[in-house]
Amino acid sequence: MALIVGSFAGIELKYIPYKGGKAATLAGLQGEVDIAGGGVHEHVDLVRAGELRNLQQTGTKDITLDNGAVMPTVGNFLPDIKPFLPIGGTYNFIVKRDTDPEVLNEIKEAFVAAAQSDGFKEMMDKKFFQLDIRTGEEADKRAAQLETVTVDTFNRHIPGSL
């Protein structure tokens, strides 16, 4: 994610792979790196405690913490990135393309209902995820968009990595 944001900002970042955002966040906390990327849910406690400063997050909207601190969306600073937000973790439900349309519709209805359930919304709020339900062609288009941006970014910044 940091490389994608850096690419839109026109700045060079040295990519250092970690096994997840929590490990990257700890690397930032320990001074191994100057900028660390990860999911908001992976570093929000350190932001609340004043151990880390959040510069931006890759959701579509600003996030206001219970203490009033605002974690701004990167879209506030880089308007060109807005069509690609949110960038980050997704929950997907995948089926074969030749699945019967009636079955697809039943799955879609169940998936949307589950994603809109109180329990799922509570989990999303707790982890600061933003609900963005896409199905069918809209989901295909979004997946292709994110894949294209990711591949292009990695090819430019880390040639031969993919």
Question: Predicted segment positions?
Answer:
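An extracytoplasmic/periplasmic, membrane-proximal ligand-sensing/linker region
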Residues: 48, 102-162
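Hinge/capping helix and adjacent helix->loop/strand transition within the periplasmic-binding protein
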Residues: 1-24, 74, 90-123
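Solvent-exposed, flexible loop/coil residues
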Residues: 22, 78, 135-137
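Ligand-binding pocket segment of bilobal, Venus flytrap-like solute-binding proteins
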Residues: 1-71
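Short, highly charged low-complexity linear segments
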Residues: 33-34, 61, 88, 146-154
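C-terminal lobe and pocket-closing loops
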Residues: 43-115
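Phosphate-coordinating loops and pocket residues in cytosolic domains that bind phosphorylated ligands
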Residues: 30, 76, 125-126
